[in-house]
Amino acid sequence: MKIVSWNVNGLARCRRNGFLKFLADAKPDVLCCQEIKGECPLNVPGYLLFWNPAKRSNYSGTLVLSRRQPLSCQYGLGIDKFDDEGRLITMEYKDYFIVNVYAPNLNTHSSPERLDFRMEWDKVLREFVTKLP
């Protein structure tokens, strides 16, 4: 099985720069994309698409392309303030889970509020993942 994770930094731009060729060449079973920055019309034969865009335009968001139908798919953590940013998709398959995560960024210019947001995100994500069956 081939699983690929890729921060595309904007799917529309990435698509213009060889995204579909990469898929055709690499042939991953699952492709997890982060920072899609909104929905972009995409038809990829042989793949099911699972979108989780941010509510804010041109911001964050995740996408999973899968050759197989998962048993279930969950978007987000179930907490609006985190889920509004489209940062997580959880795919359940028969013998495993795939969790596609685009974690909130922190840098030296981050506000104290954003630091608190990230610290809480990390705690909630850890709890979420450890509770997966």
Model features per residue range: what roles?
Residues D25-K27, Y75, Y96, L125:
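Short linear sequence motif anchored by a di-proline
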Residues I36-G38, L42-S110:
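Structured beta-strand-rich core segments of catalytic domains in phosphoester-bond hydrolases
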Residues W6-R13, G76-L77, D116-M119:
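Short, flexible loop segments at the rims of nucleotide/cofactor-binding pockets, characterized by
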Residues R15-R16, D84, L125:
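Amphipathic coiled-coil/heptad-repeat helices and related helical stalk/stem segments
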Residues M1-V44, A54-S60:
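N-terminal, active-site-proximal structural segment of metallo-dependent hydrolase catalytic domains
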